[in-house]
A protein has these predicted regions:
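Non-catalytic substrate-recognition and accessory regions of acyl/acetyltransferase enzymes
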Residues: 1-134
Length: 135
């Protein structure tokens, strides 16, 4: 996985201040496998808790990031995996399609669009969400 030198500002809601993470591009199989494993354990815990409370759980709670990343690796000219890391942990994952979609409205008709196929915050981020993006 390639680390960008540019830092990514995110707002830490618990400390009420801006902190800086690292934008990662590409795949590090071992790192993503570990992240996927950790996220799945946390998702199962959240799912059980919400079921006992009679609540629904997020649609993405069944996602298998290992499978999604393997698919992205098969199409590297089309799909790119991004992650945001803070404090040694991946806080969010996203897969972007940068070839297949084009703008339909003027003045950008025909120009390529970045299409976010999948995006997820780490399930270990407590509610209310610990981090949020900056505008």
């Amino acid at each position: 996985m390639k680390k960008y030198e540019n830092i990514v500002p995110v707002f830490d809601n618990t400390r009420r201040k801006t902190v800086y993470g690292t934008l990662l591009e590409g795949t590090d199989d071992k790192r993503f496998a570990q992240t996927s494993f950790e996220w799945e354990i946390e998702r199962q815990r959240i799912r059980r808790k919400r079921q006992t409370q009679g609540l629904s759980f997020p649609e993405h709670s069944h996602w298998d990031w290992n499978q999604k990343i393997e698919n992205a690796k098969r199409y590297p000219d089309v799909l790119t995996v991004f992650a945001i890391e803070y404090n040694g942990q991946i806080q969010g994952l996203m897969i972007v399609d940068h070839v297949l979609f084009h703008a339909k409205l003027p003045p950008d008709s025909g120009y390529p669009l970045l299409y976010v196929r999948y995006i997820e915050n780490a399930p270990h981020i407590p509610f209310p969400n610990c981090f949020r993006g900056l505008d």
